[in-house]
Amino acid sequence: MAVITKIDTFAAIGAGVIGSGWVARALANGLDVLAWDPAEGAEMQLRANVENAWPALERAGLAPGASPARLHFVPTIEACVADADFVQESAPEREALKLELHERISRAAKPDAIIASSTSGLLPTDFYARAHRPERCIVGHPFNPVYLLPLVEVLGGERTAPDTVDAALGIYRALGMRPLRVRKEVPGFIADRLLEALWREALHLVDEGVATTGEIDDAIRFGAGIRWSFMGTFLTYTLAGGEAGMRHFMQQFGPALELPWTKLVAPKLTDALIDRVVEGTAEQQGPRSIKALERYRDECITEVIAAIAAVKARHGMRYED
């Protein structure tokens, strides 16, 4: 089917942490943005989130004409999507809610507008079941902060047209993102399945008194996390195999997978475990506010991305290589 491949107006359904991240990214790319959220105080919170993100976006580089003034908060779903070229829904992860929302969104949107959901694990075939023209409906799952992290996982449902996925990949690239096409419709997609495994193991380590939340974060940020930011998991292990590469690594360390060290099944979230996690992270946060931590995080992300891009350029590589 024919869908829009170049956008001027971006619609955001839902203006929470993820939705406001999409709004900030779209504004930074010089688009007009329409937003809707039924929550009380949503517009004020959305504008505050954009304001907090804007310094990092300025450091990263704004498109010509980019301005928070191009954000328009509207009272209904229909007013939000009627003139939009691209719709990004970021509502809570409840299938029944998304079914209802996408029935309304798809009937009010332009027939050639692409409709995307930020869902982190629900399957598009299921929640687009009542959508009008489901062939133009996809998942575009981002990562927080959406306005800085480039990864977005893209996939369609059983009735999504392949041309729609291709067009969405191009639009996300135009927004400065690194789209990753998910080959199969599976719960959790790719990145969140990996992150969930790590999160479960981290909770086990806290629950068993092996480490505090701060010590676990240190194990990541001073170790594997640094390598992951530019090399990922498989290429890192390729180097661990020495000159013989991955085959040697698999032969040498593969048998250790049978031990196993990991628990895999999530621990029971008892009150005691929740208290340990909350108290540990509160100690890590210290006197800093969430907004202050967000600004610190954003500056670190922009500097890390810039540094990696500069080193890759010296080696004849693009940032996304």
Swiss-Prot record:
Its EC number is 1.1.1.108. The keyword Cytoplasm applies. Its main location: cytoplasm. Pathway: Amine and polyamine metabolism; carnitine metabolism. Coiled coil: none annotated. Pfam families: 3HCDH, 3HCDH_N. One of its GO terms (cellular component) is cytoplasm. One of its GO terms (molecular function) is NAD+ binding. Belongs to the 3-hydroxyacyl-CoA dehydrogenase family. L-carnitine dehydrogenase subfamily. This is L-carnitine dehydrogenase. It comes from Burkholderia pseudomallei (strain K96243).
